[in-house]
UniProtKB/Swiss-Prot annotation:
HAMAP family: Ribosomal_uS14_1. The keyword Transport does not apply. The keyword DNA-binding does not apply. The gene is rpsN. PANTHER family: 30S RIBOSOMAL PROTEIN S14, SMALL RIBOSOMAL SUBUNIT PROTEIN US14M. Gene3D superfamilies: 1.10.287.1480. Pfam families: Ribosomal_S14. Binds 16S rRNA, required for the assembly of 30S particles and may also be responsible for determining the conformation of the 16S rRNA at the A site. Keywords: Ribonucleoprotein, Ribosomal protein, RNA-binding, rRNA-binding. It comes from Ehrlichia ruminantium (strain Welgevonden). This is Small ribosomal subunit protein uS14. Part of the 30S ribosomal subunit. Contacts proteins S3 and S10. GO terms for molecular function: rRNA binding; structural constituent of ribosome. One of its GO terms (biological process) is translation. Belongs to the universal ribosomal protein uS14 family.
């Protein structure tokens, strides 16, 4: 299991990203728009660089909600492969069945 501080750090990044997502998207649209003057685009780039690093979605790590495991995490279920197998075998995940062929 991951340390609690690592899990909390990731949750903090998710909340910051959600809060500043629209502002970041507007600035990126200004930077990419070729019809706007170079000076305005540069000012938008400066404003974007002054935003917190943690507001970027790239810094968010997909983690298991139960164990905090960073690898082998299924996005659809938001749990790791180990927890998915445990929950699936006891029938806690609806619609998930053990395959046999």
């Amino acid at each position: 299991m991951s340390r609690k501080s690592v899990i909390q750090r990731n949750l903090k990044r998710i909340s910051i990203c959600d809060r500043l997502k629209s502002k970041r998207e507007k600035l990126r649209a200004i930077i990419k728009d070729q019809s706007i003057s170079m000076n305005d685009r540069f000012l938008a780039q400066v404003k974007l660089s002054k935003l917190p690093r943690d507001s970027s979605y790239i810094r968010i790590r997909n983690r298991c909600l139960i164990t905090g495991r960073p690898r082998g995490c299924y996005r659809k279920f938001k749990v790791s492969r180990i927890v998915l197998r445990q929950l699936g075998s006891i029938g806690q995940i609806p619609g998930l069945t053990k395959s046999s062929w």
